[in-house]
Regions:
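Short amphipathic alpha-helical segments that predominantly mediate membrane engagement
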Residues: 2-86
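Short, cationic, amphipathic peptide segments
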Residues: 74-114
Length: 114
């Protein structure tokens, strides 16, 4: 039986944690526009969750492993932005930054899978 790629698993877990945090945030907002914004970002993260699920058993590499540090840093910034979610621009920028690092790691993992 093959083992799961621990780097991809770490990215997957980070995405799930952020999706959970956004799901909690949307349940407490009273601003309809903010709810739409949060929902859009939840969709973006959910898409990456599906992509990482499809890569869980793919090959690892030093470059992929190194990418997790950038993702962790961006994830911490996103967690802070979620706590201050009323600042919509900072929140969206933080999600964008986080997903940029995630996308780079996913793209690298896909090239290793070929």
């Amino acid at each position: 039986m093959a083992n799961q790629n621990q780097t991809i698993l770490a990215i997957y877990n980070s995405l799930c944690d952020q999706q959970d945090a956004l799901s909690a945030a949307i349940q407490t907002t009273t601003d309809p526009q903010l709810a739409v914004t949060i929902s859009t970002e939840i969709d973006e993260i959910a898409h990456r969750i599906v992509l990482t699920q499809n890569l869980l058993f793919k090959q690892d590499s030093p470059q992929l492993t190194a990418s997790v540090n950038d993702i962790k840093t961006a994830s911490q910034s996103l967690t802070t932005a979620i706590a201050q979610i009323q600042n919509t621009i900072a929140f969206v920028n933080s999600v964008t930054s986080y997903l940029t690092y995630v996308d780079q790691a996913i793209d690298l993992a896909k090239t290793l899978a070929v």
